[in-house]
């Protein structure tokens, strides 16, 4: 992965992002649901979501490809059609899919770039939401439409909605990479500013 000064991705303040007008209902009891998001380098996206209260687990991996298996070396060639993704396990009694999407679009990546994030270029770095059911698809479609109508970005959102077929967990050395390697140049330049942005604007939504 080639580092860049892309950092916090968007220069738009998260304060300019509306809350989703349509969201999944808050669960009455604790539970566990999954969301799979692709927003460039999974190290960076994982680092952001690990901070949020209600997020139970974040696993880096690969989704969206036609090949029967996935590994980092092969996915990086762009030949398998997989994207780097994070699988987020969350408690719907504490945080909603809509909140996860608000963070996805305002902090985790730039959804106006399809097959790149900063200097990371290729279909494996595409912006995508892999929906597990029609409700996840509906929540995502409506929030994208809401952001486009509000002209938050000034250019179209190009995030793809793809049905979730399979999730392949990435190699162990990729998991929790940003926390374990805070001084790595790419992490310092790209992941750390995103985490700082999250803390600045979503302080009341963070783990204590």
Tell what function each PLM region has.
Residues 1-208:
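Flexible coil/turn and secondary-structure edge motifs
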């Amino acid at each position: 992965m080639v580092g860049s000064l892309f950092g916090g991705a968007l220069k738009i303040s998260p304060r300019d992002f509306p809350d989703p007008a349509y969201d999944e209902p808050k669960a009455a009891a604790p539970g566990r649901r999954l969301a799979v998001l692709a927003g460039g380098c999974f190290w960076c996206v994982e680092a952001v979501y690990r901070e949020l209260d209600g997020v139970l687990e974040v696993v880096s991996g690969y989704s969206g490809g036609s090949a029967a298996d996935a590994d980092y070396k092969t996915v990086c060639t762009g030949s398998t059609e997989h994207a780097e993704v994070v699988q987020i396990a969350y408690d719907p009694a504490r945080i909603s899919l809509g909140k996860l999407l608000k963070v996805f679009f305002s902090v985790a990546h730039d959804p106006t770039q399809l097959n790149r994030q900063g200097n990371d270029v290729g279909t494996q770095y595409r912006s995508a939401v892999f929906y597990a059911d029609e409700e996840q698809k509906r929540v995502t479609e409506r929030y994208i439409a809401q952001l486009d109508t509000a002209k938050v970005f000034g250019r179209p959102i190009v995030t793809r909605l793809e049905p979730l077929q399979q999730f392949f967990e990435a190699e162990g050395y990729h998991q929790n990479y940003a926390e374990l390697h805070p001084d790595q140049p790419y992490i310092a330049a790209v992941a750390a500013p995103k985490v700082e942005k999250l803390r600045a604007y979503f302080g009341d939504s963070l783990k204590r």
